[in-house]
Every structure is written in structure tokens, then in C-alpha cells.
């Protein structure tokens, strides 16, 4: 058993395997969020991008891949492919080779190309700006939609992955059994 000092002065007793969870009351949650926001005032996506389309592609590539690896891949990828049309002009094999290092490359290429076609056909060549519309694109789930919506369009959204889920529930910011419920509680 060990002690974990919470930033606002209290101690939390942690079991050896960190299975203990702590429920914060509303005031404690607000204090914790204030500390996080003051500590990380300029928090943003770690994926390199210069426009919403690049962020969408980078976020699709980030599944089961580190942001560092994605940023290495997208440096050349974004120089080669400027917009949705560019991904549709070349052979699938060429794009697969371009993103091979990020894993799951075949399904990612399929999703990217289908998303590009939908962006052209359904959204006048522009990345959709709502979470609901983003989630109609192949390979875009709640987390990806939230990342794009919040970072590209300034829409308040929290991207809850397994890490955010685990830590939020462990330190008491949420008390939920699913990623979806954790997201609702963090909003």
C-alpha cells in the first residue's frame, strides 16, 4: 500500500495494483480541473497538422499507433497528398506503402479513401464540422470525431481513450464503467 498525494493536499491510499478508486465531490472535481487547466493552459492535439483535413487523416492513422510515429509518417504524406482528391487519384498500394509503418495500414487506407470520397460527395470537399457528421465517415468513431471537432473547429469535446478512461476513473473525476459514460461525466 502506498500514499499518493493529490495536488490539492489530501492523500489517497492506493493499493499495490492501483485498483482503488476515489470519488471526488463536485468541489474537488472543480479544483482538480482548475489545476489541470492551469498546469496545461495550451493543451492541444499532439498530431502535426495545418488544416482540418490533415488532422482528420492524422487522427485516423493514430489508431494503434503513437503520435510520434504518425507525425513521422504524415510529414511526407501531407507533402504528397494535399486534399481528398489526391488520395483518390493514386493506387491503393501506393498509399499503403506510404503509411505501412503505422500498422493496420490496409484498413486505414480503405477508411481514408472512403472518407475522402464522402467528403467530396457529401460535404463539398470540406471536412464536416459537427461530431455527428464526422462520425458518418468510415474509420471515424467518437474519439476521432471529438479530436477533430475540438482541435480543428473549437467545438467543446473530450476525446476519451483507454488512458483517459482509466485515469479519470482512478482519480475520481469520473465513476463509470464505459468510455461513453466517462465522456459524459467529464463534460
What are the residue ranges of the model-derived segments?
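Catalytic cores of DNA base-excision repair glycosylases
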Residues: 15-187
